[in-house]
Amino acid sequence: MISMLAGNGSSVTEFVLAGLTDRPELQLPLFYLFLIIYIITVVGNLGLIILIGLNPHLHTPMYYFLFNLSFIDLCYSSVFSPKMLINFVSEKNSISYAGCMTQLFLFLFFVISECYMLTSMAYDRYVAICNPLLYKVTMSPQICSVISFAAYGMGFAGSSAHTGCMLRLTFCNVNVINHYLCDILPLLQLSCTSTYVNEVVVLIVVGINITVPSFTILISYVFILANILNIKSTQGRAKAFSTCSSHIMAISLFFGSAAFMYLKYSSGSMEQGKISSVFYTNVGPMLNPLIYSLRNKDVKVALRKSLIKFREKTDFN
């Protein structure tokens, strides 16, 4: 919908989300596919949150950050997935201007927060493997809280900068977003005013939020690898590697798919960018609980104990 401004211009009051595809025969199959993905994402992340909360032996810095990671994945997939699913079976795929800006803010908030939460987890593994004697002091509950609040603070700062700059733009005439969610680059393509400031902000904010986490994670794992190679026992070396393997997989999935998506966008291939963004926005949050639970002995033991307790309660009743 487009309303007239005072003067010769017009302003968009709602957007239309183009979605993944405009082929009618694919809408229903895609609806069921992404519904299954979303259900697995919600059940997996919510289950991991509950499992960590209910088991005292998982109340450690490592699982504190994993708790926050699952919370972020649950929230940020819920920012756009319900609307995406509705659009598969709805004829009118519209979203209000306010709704679009809200979705943009929340999506960016949780995505940037995840960057720094993954970074916090890398630092936690560095301290645990390289400075085990100082681990309890270095990763005290107070310090863990400060680190997690800093991650959310960076998310808030980044999303506020992007959304604030987006609010200053005027959208007129064309209101079809070539995406299944309100994201920065597809929205910038619709602006009928200069996007120079936005592009500078994107360059600065994205640069910071890629460089700082990537550099910190890289340095952490360089020290971790050097320390592991100095471990003489094969069993100790294998244990150290297994401690980090799940986190390395999660990092590779998140940063790899995000980099691939934005490279496709920057090359001008919007359609390929949309497809690759599915791995970044949908597949990652679904796989993270599976990666951390299937490869983690403590989580599997906690799950087994919780299931036994639940079975005992149901049998008793």
Curated annotation (Swiss-Prot):
GO terms for biological process: G protein-coupled receptor signaling pathway; sensory perception of smell. One of its GO terms (cellular component) is membrane. The gene is Or8b3. It comes from Mus musculus. Keywords: Cell membrane, G-protein coupled receptor, Glycoprotein, Membrane, Olfaction, Receptor, Sensory transduction, Transducer, Transmembrane, Transmembrane helix. The chain crosses the membrane at residues 33-53, 60-80, 98-118, 137-157, 200-220, 243-263, 275-294. Glycans are attached at N8. Residues 1-32, 81-97, 158-199, 264-274 are extracellular. Belongs to the G-protein coupled receptor 1 family. Gene3D superfamilies: Rhodopsin 7-helix transmembrane proteins. The keyword RNA-binding does not apply. GO terms for molecular function: G protein-coupled receptor activity; olfactory receptor activity. InterPro entries: GPCR_Rhodpsn, GPCR_Rhodpsn_7TM, Olfact_rcpt. It is a multi-pass membrane protein. The keyword Transmembrane applies. Odorant receptor. The lineage of its organism: Eukaryota, Metazoa, Chordata, Craniata, Vertebrata. Residues 54-59, 119-136, 221-242, 295-317 are cytoplasmic. PANTHER family: OLFACTORY RECEPTOR. Disulfide bonds: none annotated. This is Olfactory receptor 8B3. It is found in: Cell membrane.
